[in-house]
């Protein structure tokens, strides 16, 4: 019988979470040898993954938000290990988990430890890996709230422009995207490059993305002058602009902008004038629901731990 052994790497803020304590106790009663380690500062997740693998663990549970999940997923992929990952979503947005159908209730999420893992892709850019999505919004100043008027107009892209209170504050950047049989150049307001489907707390920028197809979904919100100039009339007419996105599905895409680009990788900032995004097919083994919307039919791996 395969030894049921795992390590839960838990964000330090969740140390006193009674639901987590109860769920861990339940898994131990079910026969799991489940160790728990806490993160305290930047770099801890990566260090704890290394320690877990060195100790012989082949199953890691990521307990935290999208940032914690990204850190642990990246560390596992860079270790080139066959160890698998269970997602325990404890953050505010939990964008990848929600899109993947992972339960938000702690005990139900940990039930996925007992299902077979699936091979899923990662995205890579600038030497960094991401599980969910790379996003970019231009001319935005991030604060706590987004104008309700802008939300009505921008729909799923609204969170990229957090802090804008007037239409005159919308600014675009000139960008060029190139990939296999794909080329687009122009002014853009927003960009999503997704392995997952949503970002910013439930905004579906890449609504049909699959995490196991070896491809990245590209969503561009163009900003020709006539579009920027008519946002107010779009609002008055009750129209959103989600349907104005240009979309593609590519194994890689190069993004260039002489103005520089501010990119968010599941909470990790990245900037540059010339960036290449690539899919890393099957780079991670994740325990997901059999009916996860992010799975397109790739075969199950032959074990749960």
Swiss-Prot record:
<dbReference type="InterPro" id="IPR005218">
    <property type="entry name" value="Diacylglycerol/lipid_kinase"/>
</dbReference>
<keyword id="KW-0443">Lipid metabolism</keyword>
<feature type="binding site">
    <location>
        <position position="215"/>
    </location>
    <ligand>
        <name>Mg(2+)</name>
    </ligand>
</feature>
<dbReference type="GO" id="GO:0005737">
    <property type="term" value="C:cytoplasm"/>
</dbReference>
<comment type="function">
    <text>Probably phosphorylates lipids; the in vivo substrate is unknown.</text>
</comment>
<dbReference type="GO" id="GO:0008654">
    <property type="term" value="P:phospholipid biosynthetic process"/>
</dbReference>
<dbReference type="InterPro" id="IPR050187">
    <property type="entry name" value="Lipid_Phosphate_FormReg"/>
</dbReference>
<dbReference type="InterPro" id="IPR017438">
    <property type="entry name" value="ATP-NAD_kinase_N"/>
</dbReference>
<keyword id="KW-0418">Kinase</keyword>
<dbReference type="Pfam" id="PF19279">
    <property type="entry name" value="YegS_C"/>
</dbReference>
<feature type="binding site">
    <location>
        <position position="39"/>
    </location>
    <ligand>
        <name>ATP</name>
    </ligand>
</feature>
<dbReference type="GO" id="GO:0005524">
    <property type="term" value="F:ATP binding"/>
</dbReference>
<feature type="domain" description="DAGKc">
    <location>
        <begin position="1"/>
        <end position="129"/>
    </location>
</feature>
<dbReference type="InterPro" id="IPR001206">
    <property type="entry name" value="Diacylglycerol_kinase_cat_dom"/>
</dbReference>
<keyword id="KW-0963">Cytoplasm</keyword>
<feature type="binding site">
    <location>
        <position position="213"/>
    </location>
    <ligand>
        <name>Mg(2+)</name>
    </ligand>
</feature>
<feature type="active site" description="Proton acceptor">
    <location>
        <position position="268"/>
    </location>
</feature>
<keyword id="KW-0460">Magnesium</keyword>
<dbReference type="InterPro" id="IPR022433">
    <property type="entry name" value="Lip_kinase_YegS"/>
</dbReference>
<keyword id="KW-0547">Nucleotide-binding</keyword>
<dbReference type="GO" id="GO:0001727">
    <property type="term" value="F:lipid kinase activity"/>
</dbReference>
<dbReference type="GO" id="GO:0000287">
    <property type="term" value="F:magnesium ion binding"/>
</dbReference>
<keyword id="KW-0479">Metal-binding</keyword>
<keyword id="KW-1208">Phospholipid metabolism</keyword>
<dbReference type="InterPro" id="IPR016064">
    <property type="entry name" value="NAD/diacylglycerol_kinase_sf"/>
</dbReference>
<dbReference type="InterPro" id="IPR045540">
    <property type="entry name" value="YegS/DAGK_C"/>
</dbReference>
<keyword id="KW-0067">ATP-binding</keyword>
<dbReference type="GO" id="GO:0005886">
    <property type="term" value="C:plasma membrane"/>
</dbReference>
<feature type="binding site">
    <location>
        <begin position="65"/>
        <end position="71"/>
    </location>
    <ligand>
        <name>ATP</name>
    </ligand>
</feature>
<dbReference type="Pfam" id="PF00781">
    <property type="entry name" value="DAGK_cat"/>
</dbReference>
<keyword id="KW-0808">Transferase</keyword>
<keyword id="KW-0444">Lipid biosynthesis</keyword>
<feature type="binding site">
    <location>
        <position position="210"/>
    </location>
    <ligand>
        <name>Mg(2+)</name>
    </ligand>
</feature>
<protein>
    <recommendedName>
        <fullName>Probable lipid kinase YegS-like</fullName>
        <ecNumber>2.7.1.-</ecNumber>
    </recommendedName>
</protein>
<feature type="binding site">
    <location>
        <position position="92"/>
    </location>
    <ligand>
        <name>ATP</name>
    </ligand>
</feature>
<comment type="similarity">
    <text>Belongs to the diacylglycerol/lipid kinase family. YegS lipid kinase subfamily.</text>
</comment>
<keyword id="KW-0594">Phospholipid biosynthesis</keyword>
């Amino acid at each position: 019988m395969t030894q049921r052994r795992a390590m839960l790497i838990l964000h330090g803020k969740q140390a006193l979470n009674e639901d987590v304590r109860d769920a861990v106790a339940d898994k131990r009663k079910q026969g799991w040898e489940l160790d728990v380690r806490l993160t305290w500062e930047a770099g801890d997740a990566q260090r704890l993954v290394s320690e877990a693998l060195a100790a012989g663990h082949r199953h890691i549970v990521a307990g935290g938000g999208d940032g914690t999940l990204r850190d642990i997923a990246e560390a596992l992929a860079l270790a080139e290990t066959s160890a698998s990952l269970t997602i325990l979503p404890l953050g505010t947005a939990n964008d990848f988990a929600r899109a993947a159908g992972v339960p938000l209730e702690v005990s139900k999420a940990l039930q996925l430890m007992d299902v077979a893992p699936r091979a899923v892709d990662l995205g890579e850019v600038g030497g960094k890996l991401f599980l969910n999505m790379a996003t970019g919004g231009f001319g935005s100043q991030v604060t706590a709230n987004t104008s309700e008027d802008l939300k009505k107009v921008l729909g799923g892209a609204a969170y990229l422009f957090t802090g804008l209170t007037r239409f005159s504050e919308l600014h675009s950047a000139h960008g060029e995207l190139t990939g296999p049989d794909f080329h687009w150049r122009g002014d853009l307001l927003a960009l999503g490059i997704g392995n997952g489907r949503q970002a910013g707390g439930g905004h579906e920028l890449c609504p049909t993305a699959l995490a196991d197809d070896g491809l990245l979904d590209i969503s561009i919100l163009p900003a020709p002058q006539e579009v920027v100039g008519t946002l107010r009339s779009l609002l008055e007419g009750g129209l959103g602009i989600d349907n104005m996105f240009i979309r593609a599905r590519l194994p890689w895409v190069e993004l260039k902008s002489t103005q520089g680009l501010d990119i968010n990788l599941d909470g990790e900032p990245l900037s540059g004038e010339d960036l290449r995004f690539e899919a890393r097919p099957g780079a991670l083994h994740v325990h997901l629901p059999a009916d996860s919307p992010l799975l397109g039919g790739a075969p199950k791996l032959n074990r749960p731990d």
